[in-house]
Amino acid sequence: ATEEVPEPETEEAPDVLKSLGIEIPEKDIDFTALKEENSDVYAWIYVPGTNVDYPVLQHPTDDAYYLEHNMDGSKGLPGCIYTESVNTKDFTDPNTVLYGHNMKNGSMFASLHNFEDQQVFEENPYFYIYTEDKTYVYEIFAAYKYNAIHLIYNFDLDNPEIFQNYLDQIFEVR
């Protein structure tokens, strides 16, 4: 589930957040500097209770580029957290898939395994996506291992019935 938070400069934003019991962590993200380093940066992901605190990139022509390329463009691991071009950069798709390696040194998405601990899951109910003009708050409602089937290409998640069936399957295994 996602909550799009109203713009911070509006009077409505603090009230909505307060009523939901959500405090958005302050992040000092310099998107200008990040984009100077790599113009494919368009967001930042932060997952409390983990080491996930990284820029999010999307290559314009090669969906797998950041699987084996780092922020500076060098080839190798750990790569970057990224989305494929099938997802829009404004996070309005029914399902946005963020990719990243499960590194043995605990970096990238490796620490998402922390959510296998029920206490971590309960103490960290949200993760945050920061963009230049908005902050998105996502409620973590499931944490489970998934196979390598490409979700977006194998499920028509734009179809509300198929999307609901997909969510129902998640609720069954979580």
Model-derived segments and spans:
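Solvent-exposed, non-transmembrane regions of membrane-associated and secreted proteins
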Residues: 1-174
